[in-house]
Amino acid sequence: MARRNPLLFAIVVTILFVVCYGSALIAQTPPPVDNFVASAHYGSFKKRHGKAFGGDAEEGHRFNAFKQNMQTAYFLNTQNPHAHYDVSGKFADLTPQEFAKLYLNPDYYARHLKDHKEDVHVDDSAPSGVMSVDWRDKGAVTPVKNQGLCGSCWAFSAIGNIEGQWAASGHSLVSLSEQMLVSCDNIDEGCNGGLMDQAMNWIMQSHNGSVFTEASYPYTSGGGTRPPCHDEGEVGAKITGFLSLPHDEERIAEWVEKRGPVAVAVDATTWQLYFGGVVSLCLAWSLNHGVLIVGFNKNAKPPYWIVKNSWGSSWGEKGYIRLAMGSNQCMLKNYPVSATVESPHTPHVPTTTA
């Protein structure tokens, strides 16, 4: 990946906002950050996260990245009145390039999403008019997990969707194995990226729809390695197929309401410094990260999606982020997929098993 000067990041952000949104925004170059103020915040950051660096060169590099991120957070806050960005989170000493390399997969998505098409059919029943849904409250969402230094967001997104569909259809909630996909799925590329529908396709082709429990095949790729597949474990859930949902937020909301959580891809470039609130103006160029929609609230101002991430519970709102509904924030509607699960409580849905 080509190196960019992190000191230009905030200015580039400003220019891109103006180009994309025209006169609706007033360009603001973030003010310089005083070294004394930055040093005080940096000291608190290191203490909070137990950070220690070897040598003056590395220390200086981390401080400069942190200082630049203070400017970036300032700018993002000026553009998002309902959200808060700051440098208290664990990623604040990374340059944007380092963050992207460690936690995002832009190259994989660019190579493999060209032929992604939505399925025509989703649900024949009329919308119910439900204004808010949170599948966490319905017992269909497992605790927030952590992918670590492995580019396995796709596996966490796919498995989170299957966990949610399994529980929403009437089965008991069970934490399922991301490691099964990271190590064994030979359609995707482990820590180097993957796609959620490809993962579901592999489950159908190679496992007859069966997914192991996390307890029987725990996650071990947090350090960035891909252990060999041992392809054995206790089956915790079974899918009957998968669907690529319409690229339409209302249709996605219908699926979330009636069926359960949905796996989606987003541009998470600016999530590095997200702390809380509803993101209403997300910088987005291309998809690079897989996450899980677990609910929405149309009554809120602004209305928002509830999105589960896989960077641990110390990130964002205890591992979650809220994105404003209706304006394709972070390109959330561009790649929605869901597994299907057989249940006596839901009608038959056409599936893709390829």
Swiss-Prot record:
<keyword id="KW-0843">Virulence</keyword>
<comment type="function">
    <text>The cysteine proteinases have a potential role in host-parasite interaction and virulence.</text>
</comment>
<dbReference type="GO" id="GO:0008234">
    <property type="term" value="F:cysteine-type peptidase activity"/>
</dbReference>
<dbReference type="Pfam" id="PF00112">
    <property type="entry name" value="Peptidase_C1"/>
</dbReference>
<dbReference type="InterPro" id="IPR013128">
    <property type="entry name" value="Peptidase_C1A"/>
</dbReference>
<dbReference type="InterPro" id="IPR025660">
    <property type="entry name" value="Pept_his_AS"/>
</dbReference>
<feature type="active site">
    <location>
        <position position="153"/>
    </location>
</feature>
<keyword id="KW-0865">Zymogen</keyword>
<feature type="disulfide bond">
    <location>
        <begin position="184"/>
        <end position="229"/>
    </location>
</feature>
<feature type="disulfide bond">
    <location>
        <begin position="150"/>
        <end position="191"/>
    </location>
</feature>
<keyword id="KW-0645">Protease</keyword>
<feature type="active site">
    <location>
        <position position="309"/>
    </location>
</feature>
<comment type="similarity">
    <text>Belongs to the peptidase C1 family.</text>
</comment>
<keyword id="KW-0325">Glycoprotein</keyword>
<dbReference type="InterPro" id="IPR025661">
    <property type="entry name" value="Pept_asp_AS"/>
</dbReference>
<dbReference type="InterPro" id="IPR000169">
    <property type="entry name" value="Pept_cys_AS"/>
</dbReference>
<protein>
    <recommendedName>
        <fullName>Cysteine proteinase 1</fullName>
        <ecNumber>3.4.22.-</ecNumber>
    </recommendedName>
</protein>
<feature type="active site">
    <location>
        <position position="289"/>
    </location>
</feature>
<feature type="signal peptide">
    <location>
        <begin position="1"/>
        <end position="24"/>
    </location>
</feature>
<keyword id="KW-0732">Signal</keyword>
<keyword id="KW-0788">Thiol protease</keyword>
<dbReference type="Pfam" id="PF08246">
    <property type="entry name" value="Inhibitor_I29"/>
</dbReference>
<keyword id="KW-0378">Hydrolase</keyword>
<keyword id="KW-1015">Disulfide bond</keyword>
<feature type="propeptide" description="Activation peptide">
    <location>
        <begin position="25"/>
        <end position="125"/>
    </location>
</feature>
<dbReference type="InterPro" id="IPR039417">
    <property type="entry name" value="Peptidase_C1A_papain-like"/>
</dbReference>
<dbReference type="InterPro" id="IPR000668">
    <property type="entry name" value="Peptidase_C1A_C"/>
</dbReference>
<dbReference type="InterPro" id="IPR013201">
    <property type="entry name" value="Prot_inhib_I29"/>
</dbReference>
<feature type="disulfide bond">
    <location>
        <begin position="282"/>
        <end position="330"/>
    </location>
</feature>
<dbReference type="InterPro" id="IPR038765">
    <property type="entry name" value="Papain-like_cys_pep_sf"/>
</dbReference>
<dbReference type="GO" id="GO:0006508">
    <property type="term" value="P:proteolysis"/>
</dbReference>
<feature type="glycosylation site" description="N-linked (GlcNAc...) asparagine">
    <location>
        <position position="208"/>
    </location>
</feature>
